[in-house]
Amino acid sequence: MNKDFKYKNTVGIESTYPKDMPEDHSNIPVWNSENWFYEDVIIDHKIRSLRRTISEGEAMQFNGMVLDMHPYVGDEHFAKNEGLFKKRLVAGAMVFSYGLGLVATNCVNSFSYGYDRLRFIKPVFIGDTIYTIRKNMEKKPKYEKMGLVRTSYEVFKGKGEIVLYCEHLHSVLYKKPQDFKDQFEKK
């Protein structure tokens, strides 16, 4: 729990209990997985990730994996001699992936619905250290069995310079769907 108790820890609120393994194994809480529902989402709740430095090797591995060989991310000579920043960038797709991955909660009742307002605000360079702050912005009933939750992600580098912003829509299962039967969109 953090110092001022304003934001409660979320990992390990409740675990899942698979029936296809020995019961004594099933009763052990699952590492890095959560079991919260729509009703459990607290608006304005924030979490912050650990920091992570992006190395040259992993940047090139990511570029190769996604076939992004733009000179700004893959050509040291171009970046130094002709590029606007005079050094190589980390691919925006990598900053997005790493930034969101740093605060991924692996909730078994939540499913990605899509992303809005993705912006690459400032460049990230090889050797930069990033961290992410995630905030629950809003929620609304949407379907018979699940609602939508909008979450913001702000990725920072160094001592707090914002480099990326996006909003993630999650569809999240209701704990008690009957409580929302008159609130969801009917088709």
Predicted feature residues:
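A structural preference for long, well-packed, hydrophobic secondary-structure segments
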Residues: 117-122, 168-173, 180-184
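Hydrophobic small-molecule pocket/channel-lining residues, especially in calycin-type beta-barrels
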Residues: 62, 71, 79-82, 110, ...
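Hydrophobic beta-sheet segments that form the core/acyl-binding groove
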Residues: 114-158
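Short peripheral tails and domain-boundary helices/loops at the edges of structured domains
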Residues: 3-7, 151-174
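A short acidic/small-residue loop/turn micro-motif
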Residues: 55, 138-139, 170-172
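Hot-dog-fold acyl-thioester-processing enzymes
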Residues: 2-113, 175-187
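Intrinsic-disorder/low-complexity, polar/charged segments enriched in Ser/Thr/Lys/Arg/Asp/Glu/Gln
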Residues: 36, 42-49, 129-131, 148-150, ...
